[in-house]
Amino acid sequence: MSQPSSDTQRQPAIVILDFGSQYSELIARRVRETEVFSVVLGYSTSAEELRRMAPKGIILSGGPSSVYAEHAPLCDPGIWDLGIPVLGVCYGMQLMVQQLGGVVEAATGKAEYGKAPLEVDDPTDLLTNVDNGSTMWMSHGDSVKALPEGFVRLAHTANTPEAAVAHLQRKLYGVQFHPEVVHSTCGMALIRNFVYHVCGCDPDWTTAAFIDEAVALVREQVGDKRVLLALSGGVDSSTLAFLLKKAIGDQLTCMFIDQGFMRKGEPEFLMDFFDRKFNIHVEYINARQRFIGKLEGITDPEEKRKIIGTEFIRVFEEESKRLGPFDYLAQGTLYPDVIESAGTNVDPKTGERVAVKIKSHHNVGGLPKDLQFKLVEPLRKLFKDEVRKVGRSLGLPEEIVRRHPFPGPGLAIRILGEVTDEKLDCLRDADLIVRQEIKEAGLYHDIWQAFAVLLPVRSVGVMGDKRTYAWPIVLRCVSSEDGMTADWSRLPYDLMETISNRIVNEVKGVNRVVLDITSKPPGTIEWE
């Protein structure tokens, strides 16, 4: 399988070196919100490689390690002599201090976790427009005991004397808090200060610029070859369809494989929307029985994902021979998909970065090794909010742009355990009620995802003076900005009551509705 080459090839203005923080990608997203392109690289990226990339700034992420630990992850010390501005965040600040001759130790007093008011001592370029007393998010058990030569304090908190520091002449900055999280009220002001005032970046990472570059890169990669797109009807594949149509016109063929795991009425909606309303021809393939047959007796969620992903590509290969030839397979893979399928962390025993696979993503984890297509994935460096902006700019209607995310394997991973036709019918009806009621309440666009999950157990109930023994449905509603982290949505009680009453009365085989109040982390948004 060839590696995708349709990422944007522009050099990043800001490079984030990742030391294992759960917020590393969030830092990248915040920088991009300032219309400055950023990427996340491993902490071991050499100073020479960074010199060749020539970013205007470097950000060192936080991380779970202690800089004085035996196998602590370290950056190339040559970074300090590149003449490139550096901002260290939490662990990144401590690493900067230690490598440049300062002292970092375990906090002797009270460790600082959560919100803390920041007292600004020196409103330099980094802290311009950062209000004195503004709330910042702390999460550290170590602290700076002595600053390196040439460094000065910029701000402090009640428990952290060196909450923000700098070597002003060398443009080396460190903050002990996390400006990237929403809890830091002036965090974005600080990030903008670093990006614009310290680094001198230009705000040129715009939707229009991305579209122009992506179109040019797709044309360069594909040439006069034909491209086959797996169209699902979600915002990702729909945006991709519009982008590819703009780039290569009739060289694009969209194929919708109905694997039987879509939500109620979606196959019909999809065909009408693209084929008739927007004149983008879609080949409809009914493969419902083929997919359900492959999942017979399968209960392991990872195996289900891989079977669906493999079978999906097999159908593509077969249909491409009938409709083709095609050289490229287009996929709507996004940045969080890649991260979640092969996340990285630091092994505290060895200091090495290791893969921590949470779950295979349908686009990137279930592909067979003998894939006959080359991949074109022009969206794989975008976050979901960026994809929505691209979709709007390309003319995609709000009905599609603001649809809730839906996993590639569909309802098959919202049915825990074995997937059957009976369970699919049950879940479709329950899921439709959830979405109908949330839309009726005017909350659909305030929620990241809202859906139903069918559990592989039965519970006792009483309906019409008779004992029932039926499946429970889980109501899963979460709020998020990008899907990387999420909190459970606080729905009104009367809305939850309406949803529950409708499901147990209208959906055959269900006698109980429960609410999932787990955030991500520790849970994931989907149950499988």
Curated annotation (Swiss-Prot):
Return the EC number.
6.3.5.2
Catalytic residues identified in the record = 90, 178, 180
InterPro entries, per the entry: Class_I_gatase-like (IPR029062), GATASE (IPR017926), GMP_synth_C (IPR001674), GMP_synth_GATase (IPR004739), GMP_synthase (IPR022955), GMPS_ATP_PPase_dom (IPR025777), Rossmann-like_a/b/a_fold (IPR014729)
Q: Where does ATP bind?
A: 232-238
Pathway per its UniProt entry is: Purine metabolism; GMP biosynthesis; GMP from XMP (L-Gln route): step 1/1
Q: Which domain of life is it from?
A: Bacteria
Q: Molecular function terms in GO for this entry?
A: ATP binding; GMP synthase activity
Keyword list, A-Z? ATP-binding, Glutamine amidotransferase, GMP biosynthesis, Ligase, Nucleotide-binding, Purine biosynthesis
Subunit: Homodimer.
User: HAMAP family from the xrefs?
Assistant: GMP_synthase (MF_00344)
Q: Which NCBIfam families match?
A: guaA_Cterm, guaA_Nterm, PRK00074.1
Name the job this protein performs.
Answer: Catalyzes the synthesis of GMP from XMP.
- State what protein this is by name: GMP synthase [glutamine-hydrolyzing]
UniProt source species: Synechococcus sp. (strain CC9605)
